[in-house]
Amino acid sequence: MPRQRSPLFVLFLTVFIDLIGFGIVIPILPLYAEHFHASPIAIGWLTGIYSGMQIIFTPILGKLSDRFGRRPVLFVSIVGTAIGFALMGLAHGLPLLFAARILAGITGGNIAIPQAYIADVTAPEKRSRAMGLIGAAFGLGFTFGPLIGGLMSRISYSAPFYFSAGLAVINAVLVYLILPESLSREQRARPHERASMVEVFRHGRGAMFAIVLGTYFFLIVGFSIMTTLFALFTERRFGYDAQANGYMFGFVGIVSVIVQGGLIGRLIKMFGEVALARTGMILTTISLALLPMSNSLAFLLLVSAGLAAGSGFASPPLSGLASQMVEANWQGRALGILQSAGSTARLLGPLLGGWLLTFDMQKPIAQYGYTPFLAGAFLCLIGAIFAFCFKKPAKDRSTEDIAVGV
């Protein structure tokens, strides 16, 4: 298959549409669950169970894509996502809503497949910039998705879920008709190979892969604490309502798109993946520590931009480095393990952040949010320390010298 830009463009559209559907659900799901008399604890589990399923099934889907090809596994998983969204819209109680979230979490583990596809069709020195396209799709999806969801909720609580199901159907058709397969039969892993973490480490640079994994995990734990509590923080500190918080999340999404979709290639060319990952971890740590000190809109916007830029600087290089730590036909499994670490972090971060916030509930407004956000900053600092233990792969040396934006 010729290595050209069109598959990456189709892949970008695939992830973008997928993330719009996911983003639509974000502002609606808690209110939808309350409609069924869900307690706060039940809502927490309803949110976390999605990531819990991703923890289990992301590496499995990565293995299946290594064995059977990226395109068919991506197609089937997107169809499953459409069914999950439709079931959410049809739900008349919590049992079916939980079942739908479980299905959505299982099929939502497919994010490793686009990353593995990129690893298949790009040279190592251009890989992190291409990974930035995935980050840009995330940013756009999280920018427009919640806004669309908020607007559609005026029709009914179930309308956004039906709309998301329709988007997933369009996405499945797009993958089936347009996206070419990136793996030849010779490149696909043999049936007897297993996707255990130990074997992935054995088929690459195990120690460095573990360090990349740890860095990514702490980044996502800290960042997910922020995303979970941001609306509660701004509501109490500034009196922001859902619409105002939607604008704030939109701003964060725009910054993410600019960084991961436009700047990442040039920055990797100038500084290299390792240096950029370290810079992103430090910037995220500082921004999280400054967030509870926000006392004006200008300061809040500045800190929010720092958080978006920091995670945008760190995440694509970490994905690119992880793919370079293993042999070619193990990249899907390696990236699947990386995304499972992210899913674990997205499960633990909200639970940890919510628990830590209880210590601030009786404090003055000026002190509200310090405990969870400073804890998140500390966790990101641990990740930054991990990042300073990186040793570049020999083949990665060119990332500082070769133009990756071309």
Language-model segment annotations:
Residues 1-5, 180-214, 237, 405-406:
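Juxtamembrane intracellular "pre-TM" segments in multi-pass secondary transporters
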Residues 55-94:
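Conserved MFS/SLC helix-loop-helix module at the cytosolic interface between two early adjacent transmembrane helices
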Residues 153-166, 355-379:
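A membrane-interface helix-boundary motif in multi-pass transporters
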Residues 27-41, 228-244:
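Short amphipathic helix-loop junctions that connect adjacent transmembrane helices
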Residues 58-69, 259-273, 357:
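Helix-to-loop junctions at the C-terminal end of transmembrane segments
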Residues 174-178, 374-406:
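Multi-pass alpha-helical transporter architecture, strongest
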Residues 100-139:
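Cytoplasmic helix-loop-helix junction between adjacent transmembrane helices
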Residues 274-318:
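C-terminal transmembrane helical hairpin of 12-TM major facilitator-type secondary transporters
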